[in-house]
Amino acid sequence: MTHPKIVDKPWGREVWYAHNDQYAGKILEVDAGHLLSLQMHEVKHETLYLHSGRMRFTRGDDVFEWNPGESIEIPPHTVHRMEAIEKSVILEVSTPQLDDVVRLEDRYGRTTE
């Protein structure tokens, strides 16, 4: 058994529970009112599942409310952003490129990693 890696973020935290050369799994805990980066990925392909809370989600030109029990697929080169309407918990599974983040806009002053 291994212990997950906890990564503190300005909007909450990530719990990395799986990361190998084939896939990655994370839990994102986003505090109410916080906004993640407007971003895209060059290679990373991810699927997100909203476990609890409510989010406003931007994917390309579409903005919609995201509710518990719904999943969203984010292929590479898809511009996207999440905003927590309520404290939210998201399950993310993806290809293993966790450092593949191209930030286009960030409320917290972070740049591309």
Predicted regions and their residues:
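A short glycine-rich, His/Asp/Glu-containing loop-to-beta-strand
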Residues: T2-Q39, K44
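Short hydrophobic/aromatic-rich beta-strand segments that constitute the beta-sheet cores
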Residues: G25, S37-L38, F57-R59, E92
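Glycine- and acidic-residue-biased ligand/ion/polar-headgroup-sensing regions
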Residues: V43-R56
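Short, surface-exposed secondary-structure edge patches
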Residues: I27, T47, D61-F64
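Double-stranded beta-helix
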Residues: T2-K9, R81-E113
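Short acidic-glycine-tyrosine-enriched beta hairpin
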Residues: G60-V79
